[in-house]
Amino acid sequence: MGFTQQQEALVNSSWESFKQNPSYSVLFYTIILEKAPAAKGMFSFLKDSAGVVDSPKLQAHAEQVFGMVRDSAIQLQATGEVVLKNGSLGAIHIQKGVVDPHFVVVKEALLKTIKEASGDKWSEELSIAWEVAYDGLATAIKKAMS
């Protein structure tokens, strides 16, 4: 069964909740660094800081990550596959030293952040929708890395 309109709607509505509060971007990177402290150096806006500090670059990158997952949901619903809009995304991930376990860490951080942003609207269906959309994006990035 393909990605449904309902799943796309769930991702879209929770994406809006995420965007409304900049503290969710800080939470996202805090979770990543709790799970993979060595990943700090992969992010230019974090590598010289003592911890996760809110900044315009951090906000922009978090919105870009979550936005790409949202775009993946739209693509999955429309065509059943994710095609990267940024052709250099694979090369960027290779340059930063991203490997498979990093995708797992980011997925976990993304889901925990969306759970927090969604509050009482969080559900198993919402989690699955974000998981499937993220997995589609991760697969497309990994393909671009090979």
From Swiss-Prot:
Its main location: cytoplasm. Pfam families: Globin. Keywords: Cytoplasm, Heme, Iron, Metal-binding, Nitration, Nitrogen fixation, Nodulation, Nucleus, Oxygen transport, Phosphoprotein, Transport. Transmembrane segments: none annotated. Nitrated in effective nodules and particularly in hypoxic conditions; this mechanism may play a protective role in the symbiosis by buffering toxic peroxynitrite NO(2)(-). Nitration level decrease during nodule senescence. Phosphorylation at Ser-44 disrupts the molecular environment of its porphyrin ring oxygen binding pocket, thus leading to a reduced oxygen consumption and to the delivery of oxygen O(2) to symbiosomes. It comes from the Eukaryota. The modification Nitrated tyrosine is found at residues 24, 29, 134. GO terms for cellular component: cytosol; nucleus. GO terms for biological process: nodulation; response to abscisic acid. Residues 2-146 form the Globin domain. It is found in: Cytoplasm, Cytosol; Nucleus. InterPro entries: Globin, Globin-like_sf, Globin/Proto, Leghaemoglobin-like, Leghaemoglobin_Fe_BS. The modification Phosphoserine is found at residue 44. SUPFAM superfamilies: Globin-like. Accumulates in root nodules after inoculation by bacteria of the genus Rhizobium. Heme b binds at residues 44, 93, 96. One of its GO terms (molecular function) is oxygen carrier activity. O2 binds at residue 61. Belongs to the plant globin family. Monomer. PANTHER family: LEGHEMOGLOBIN-RELATED, NON-SYMBIOTIC HEMOGLOBIN 2. Leghemoglobin that reversibly binds oxygen O(2) through a pentacoordinated heme iron. In root nodules, facilitates the diffusion of oxygen to the bacteroids while preventing the bacterial nitrogenase from being inactivated by buffering dioxygen, nitric oxide and carbon monoxide, and promoting the formation of reactive oxygen species (ROS, e.g. H(2)O(2)). This role is essential for symbiotic nitrogen fixation (SNF). This is Leghemoglobin 49. It comes from Vicia faba (Broad bean).
